Each structure stands twice: as structure tokens, then as C-alpha cells.
């Protein structure tokens, strides 16, 4: 579709103050001229300069069906790098759909999902990491997640990777000259310099990889299983974190028989909470199925909040739950601290990252839990304005580049020939170029834009 003029609604569906229909392509002004009539007869769409706006009517044939504003952007000074016209009509799906239909009748083609950002990428307005950041910014729920995406959109990751590429390229140029032209008087690279450059690249990539999980939590949120025995306070905890009575709470054991789901925003982290059935032996087939689902949800979760009744001694079910949390991102919450304590927390402490006394009926405990979750997931240590990796594709490329740089450094230290070092440096450069999009195949481009919606 590259080369055609495309049209789509660029705003979210549903009622609103305005809706925006975006045109992009060489015929954008021609299409706009057929569907938009300036209120000032002396103003002509074809003569509109970039970064200007005109008020007028939207028309289909001779019928005016709405009034609004047309914004004009001349190539290459637009989001896509092409001529772009953004038509702002009144919100509501009927008017916006009619405006799109009028644009299509005037010669535009329907835009594919992500088509505008794809064109921005192909026209050099955005790098690949910046293009991926557009969707991250749209999807962000918290301020830190949005800041991470905005940093990537502003080129933070591209600059960081570019610095590593420049260092390796300079190294490789010298290596290639030394290996390929032995008859020339090319000075051999100093071993200490080789180790220093390769070590610096490896360390930088290690930092990006190390922060990937926490960065992903800020961008995408995390599934959180709330598990524990009946009446330990799981549903009360869900209601505390949600800020309203999402789950039924009664003194009757086994009240929760199926998984109750609720998305909540805790600071800058979105938690997809799953309140599960109480863990105990039961003859009830329905409750037993709920307990089976509880264990399954525990295995799948990216975060576990294990709730224990602090007013009772640990039971066999408590200890089994603790053992299953070993090595997992799990926090033990010893509930009911407002009552005399009977629970020996030392019995479960070895299995958890942290053990916290709480009262799931008090707002103060919510703040304690929010801070603990941020510490455990590493999000409290993240600089939201720094370079960060987004998505499995970027992580995979960074891992390959890091491993290749490490291999080159090991080759130097083992005394292998410089040709072996050169091969590893080449592999690292290839991986970094794939990360930034300089080696972009059509299949990889499709992967980048498959998450996008129509209109972006």
C-alpha cells in the first residue's frame, strides 16, 4: 500500500468531543479538497501551507454533514513524512465513519493496522525502536511506563545502541585491516584496549537486559495470584487493593470457589489480581476444582501474594503453600496483625523474598504492600527516562549481541587469533543492527507493526 493515499479514524471509538480522520499520501490534499469546504471562500485546500488549520464543512457530494477543522502538514514535515491532512469532526462513530467513507469515495484507500507508523519508519521519520515505542506509549497505564515509552520514542535506546555500534565498528575496522591486509604495516590492536572496549559493550548490554523484566512490568503490568487457606484474608486483600468490595467476604470457609479477577493500579504498576479458592482438603467436587485452579494460577503468576492467618499456628496447607512459593517472586503476608499473633513466621521465611505482618482491613497495609511489590519487581530502581528494551524481539537481539561481545572478549583473553575475535565482533554488530532496524526484513517489519491498531 506504500505510495497510495490512506485514510482511517485516528481517535478511539465511541462518543467524544471530537474524532480525527487522518489522511496520508501524495493525494491527501486532493482527497481533502473533495470532502472539506473552507468557511472562508478565499481559502483553498490545495494552497494550504504546512502547519496551518482551516475551519469549514465536511461534505459528501453537495451535502454538508458536519463542521470541523482541517490541519495540514506538508511532506516531509509530518508524522509519516508524507503529505498529511487531519480532519477533526464532531465525536461519535456515525459522523466519523461517514467522513472516512467520503474520503474513500474521493480516492483514498483504507489504512491497515499500524500503517501510519509503518510509513514513518519506512520514510526515515522513526527508527525501529522508536516505532515500537509508539505502541508502548499508547498502551501505558502508569506514569513510569509512559515515561519509559516516551524515552524510547525520543531515541534513548537508539542512541545507547548506536554508541555500542560505533565502538564495535571502529574496533572491527582495525581488526579487518589487520587480518585482511597482513602485508600492510597495520599496527596490531593493544590487548588491553580490546578487552576494555568489549567489556564496556558487554556491561552496557548486561544493564539493559538486567532491567528488562522490571521495565516490562512497568509497561505491561503483571499477573498476581492471591493464595492461601480459607479465611486467611485473601478476598479482603483483593478488596483492599481494588479500593472497593470486589469479592464477597464472609466468615464461612470456602466462600470463594472460583478465581475472581480484578485489574488494579498500584502506584505505577498494573496488577491483574486473581483471588483464588482457599487451599484445604475437601470432599466437595466444586470446591476441589476451585483449589486445583488456585494451584494452577500460582504456577502461572508473575507475582504471588501468599496470605497467612496470623491469629493461628501454621498448618500443613500453609507449609505446602510456602514450599511451592520457593524460588518464585512471592511475598508472604501474615494477616490479622491486629489480633494476638500465633503464627511462627520463621517457618515460612526461607521460601519468600519478604514476610510482612499486615492487616488487610487497614489502608496503612495497602501502602506497605505497594512498596514491597515495587521492591520485589525491581521497579523502584528503574530510571524511567533511561534507555530500555521493549518486547521479546529487542531482548533477543540484545542477548545475542551481549553473548557475541562476551565471546570476543573471551577469545582475546584465551589468546585466540584476531580473526576469531573479528568473527564475534561481526556477530555482535549484526545483532545490534537487527535491534535498531538497519537489517530489517519485511517479515521483521510485519512483526513490529502487528500490535498496532488502525489509525496509528
Regions found by a protein language model. Name each.
Residues 287-311:
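Inter-motif core of Ras-like GTPase G domains
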Residues 242, 277-278, 302, 309, ...:
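Short glycine-/small-residue-rich Rossmann-like dinucleotide-binding loops
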Residues 1-147, 151, 155, 331:
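A glycine-rich (often HGG/GG-containing) alpha/beta subdomain
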Residues 273, 307, 333:
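Generic enzyme active-site microenvironment
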Residues 55-65, 70-74, 254-282, 300:
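Switch I (G2) and immediately adjacent beta-strands of P-loop GTPase domains
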Residues 271, 303, 331:
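Short, Asp-centered acidic motifs that coordinate Mg2+ and/or phosphate
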Residues 2-13, 143-265, 282-284, 313-456:
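C-terminal-of-GTPase-core extension/linker across diverse P-loop GTPases
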Amino acid at each position: 500500500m506504500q505510495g497510495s493515499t490512506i485514510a482511517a479514524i485516528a481517535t478511539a471509538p465511541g462518543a467524544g468531543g471530537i474524532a480525527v480522520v487522518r489522511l496520508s499520501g501524495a493525494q491527501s490534499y486532493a482527497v481533502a479538497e473533495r470532502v472539506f469546504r473552507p468557511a472562508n471562500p478565499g481559502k483553498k485546500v490545495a494552497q494550504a501551507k504546512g502547519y496551518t488549520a482551516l475551519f469549514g464543512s465536511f461534505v459528501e457530494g453537495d451535502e454538508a454533514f458536519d463542521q470541523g477543522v482541517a490541519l495540514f502538514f506538508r511532506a516531509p514535515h509530518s508524522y509519516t513524512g508524507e503529505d498529511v491532512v487531519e480532519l477533526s469532526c464532531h465525536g461519535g462513530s456515525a459522523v466519523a465513519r461517514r467522513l472516512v467513507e467520503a474520503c474513500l469515495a474521493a480516492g483514498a484507500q483504507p489504512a491497515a493496522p499500524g500503517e501510519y507508523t509503518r510509513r514513518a519508519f519506512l520514510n526515515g521519520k522513526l527508527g525501529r525502536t522508536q516505532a515500537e515505542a509508539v505502541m508502548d506509549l499508547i498502551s501505558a497505564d502508569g506514569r513510569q511506563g509512559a515515561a519509559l515509552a516516551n524515552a524510547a520514542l525520543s531515541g534513548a535506546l537508539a542512541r545507547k545502541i548506536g554508541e555500542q555500534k560505533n565502538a564495535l565498528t571502529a574496533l572491527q575496522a582495525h581488526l579487518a585491516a589487520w587480518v585482511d591486509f597482513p602485508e600492510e604495516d597495520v599496527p596490531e590492536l593493544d590487548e588491553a584496549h580490546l578487552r576494555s572496549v568489549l567489556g564496556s559493550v558487554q556491561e552496557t548490554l548486561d544493564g539493559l537486559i538486567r532491567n528488562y523484566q522490571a521495565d516490562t512490568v512497568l509497561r505491561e503490568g503483571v499477573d498476581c495470584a492471591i493464595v492461601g487457606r480459607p479465611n486467611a484474608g485473601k478476598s479482603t486483600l483483593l478488596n483492599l487493593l481494588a479500593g472497593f468490595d470486589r469479592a464477597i467476604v464472609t466468615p464461612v470457609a470456602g466462600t470463594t470457589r472460583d478465581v475472581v479477577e480484578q485489574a488494579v493500579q498500584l502506584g505505577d504498576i498494573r496488577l491483574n489480581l486473581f483471588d483464588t479458592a482457599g487451599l484445604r482438603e475437601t470432599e466437595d467436587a466444586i470446591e476441589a476444582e476451585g483449589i486445583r485452579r488456585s494451584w494452577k494460577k500460582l504456577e502461572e503468576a508473575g507475582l504471588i501474594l501468599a496470605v497467612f492467618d496470623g491469629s493461628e499456628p501454621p498448618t500443613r496447607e500453609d507449609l505446602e503453600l510456602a514450599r511451592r512459593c520457593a524460588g518464585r517472586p512471592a511475598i508472604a503476608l501474615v494477616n490479622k496483625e491486629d489480633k494476638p499473633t500465633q503464627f511462627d513466621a520463621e517457618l515460612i521465611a526461607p521460601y519468600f523474598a519478604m514476610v510482612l505482618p499486615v492487616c488487610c482491613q487497614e489502608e496503612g497495609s495497602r501502602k506497605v504492600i505497594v512498596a514491597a511489590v515495587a521492591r520485589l519487581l525491581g521497579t523502584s530502581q528503574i530510571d524511567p527516562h533511561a534507555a530500555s528494551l521493549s518486547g521479546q524481539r529487542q531482548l533477543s537481539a540484545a542477548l545475542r549481541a551481549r553473548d557475541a561481545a562476551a565471546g570476543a572478549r573471551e577469545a582475546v583473553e584465551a589468546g585466540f587469533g584476531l580473526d576469531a575475535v573479528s568473527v564475534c565482533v561481526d556477530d555482535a554488530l549484526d545483532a545490534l543492527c537487527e535491534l535498531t532496524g538497519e537489517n530489517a526484513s519485511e517479515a521483521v517489519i510485519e512483526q513490529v507493526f502487528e500490535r498496532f491498531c488502525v489509525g496509528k
